[in-house]
């Protein structure tokens, strides 16, 4: 079994094989489905606007082209893509071109299986291969699981911006984390 595969036994003790691979544009509908669910149901992404088909393709294409879009899928499932990770532009100014921001999302059924950690590890390597220098994580400060995950992979907390955002009627603090890729 390769480092990007994992066999996980569920309640019925049926082994499922999860595989991480580079995303393609054919994965766009599945990525959009997972991302839009997070838009509706979580505080992880600070927008209430779901992506449509064209918006999802335009957002995903540059990261697919540079090799910093990954998916995790489970063999034999009808909706086999159960998560994704991307490293995309942190800022539009060219001086920030080698600094990217990570985003990792899993469907609820795929959470708690170590797949987020596998995606983050693979994304760090993909970003390194793409020539990126710094990986940034912008995390809702109350999301301790995400903060701990990033710490495990060498990210340090740069700071917390109080009251940086708002979603679902809640005022949210933002934890900024970074990791060198060199």
Language model region names:
Residues 32-59:
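Conserved GNAT-fold acetyl-CoA-binding loop/helix
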Residues 112-127, 148-152:
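Conserved acetyl-CoA-binding loop-helix of GNAT-fold acetyltransferases
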Residues 127-139:
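Conserved GNAT acetyl-CoA-binding A-motif
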């Amino acid at each position: 079994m390769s480092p990007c595969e994992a066999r996980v036994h569920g309640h019925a003790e049926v082994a499922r094989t999860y595989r991480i691979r580079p995303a393609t544009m054919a994965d766009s509908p599945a990525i959009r489905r997972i991302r839009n669910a997070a838009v509706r149901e979580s505080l992880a992404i600070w927008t209430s606007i779901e992506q449509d088909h064209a918006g999802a393709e335009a957002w995903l294409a540059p990261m697919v082209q540079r090799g910093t879009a990954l998916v995790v899928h489970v063999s034999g499932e009808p909706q086999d893509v159960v998560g994704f990770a991307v490293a995309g532009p942190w800022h539009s100014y060219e001086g920030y071109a080698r600094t990217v921001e990570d985003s990792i999302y899993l469907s609820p059924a795929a959470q708690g299986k170590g797949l987020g950690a596998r995606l983050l590890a693979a994304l760090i390597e993909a970003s390194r291969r793409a020539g990126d220098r710094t990986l940034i994580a912008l995390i809702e400060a109350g999301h301790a699981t995400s903060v701990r995950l990033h710490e495990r992979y060498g990210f340090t907390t740069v700071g917390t911006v109080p009251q940086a955002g708002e979603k679902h009627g809640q005022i949210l603090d933002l934890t900024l984390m970074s990791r060198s890729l060199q």
